Amino acid sequence: MRDEHESQMKGEGGAPADRYAIRYYQRLWAEGGLMGKPEHVNGHGFVMACPGRSSDVIHIYVWIADACIQDIRWQCHMCDPWMQVAGDILCHVARGTPSAGVLQWTWEDFEHRLGGRSTLIVEHAGAAMLTLHKAVIDHQVRLCLADQQGGGAHLDPGLKLRELGFAGRAGQQRLRRRLEETFAAFDLRIPHVKMQEWVALGTVQDVSLTVQSLVERQVIQRILGQGCGFPRSFEEQLAAQA
């Protein structure tokens, strides 16, 4: 019965699953993994990683303190099994590491925990890395927008920017300077109209999602360079948006 079940586990396009992916998936549900949500969260990222398989998304939640990922969990209720495996592996790999190093992981880091090479997990590892990077960006935005006395780790994503003191033209200039300095590594350039929208009505979450979107293609190229890929339907959707 087990062999029959394993033979039915496939990836996108009907690609057969391999023993490493199947064993990890079975162990994940038998023993439990890093699913769920940490008790404390100060960064959250999500990606529709498998648009060809599901309308659901993978979420990664982090608790970052002292520039280190202290706790990390994933949720992906309807994603295919291989996205769940990739997400769980990355959470184990990243827990306890510096948050600044989230784009330094390579396929070898996944393979070491998986026990062998799996084409299916290679195709999902990049989506997991992208989701984690978005969670770290979300945390960085919260810190960036916090007041000088701190509190960024607990900043409510729904808080209006005007409640944080960003108002008028001076608020726009101060906001732009903070964000572009924080994300200088990506040569971030924020459209003027966005600055106006944010200061008028925007929230912390609005800023975070826009920054994530502006740097996404750069991040994807870096991830691909690390030997990690994306589900076929994700790549097709990305190409259609180009």
Predicted regions and their residues:
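Domain-level signature for proteins that mediate thiol-based redox and metal-cofactor handling
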Residues: 2-242
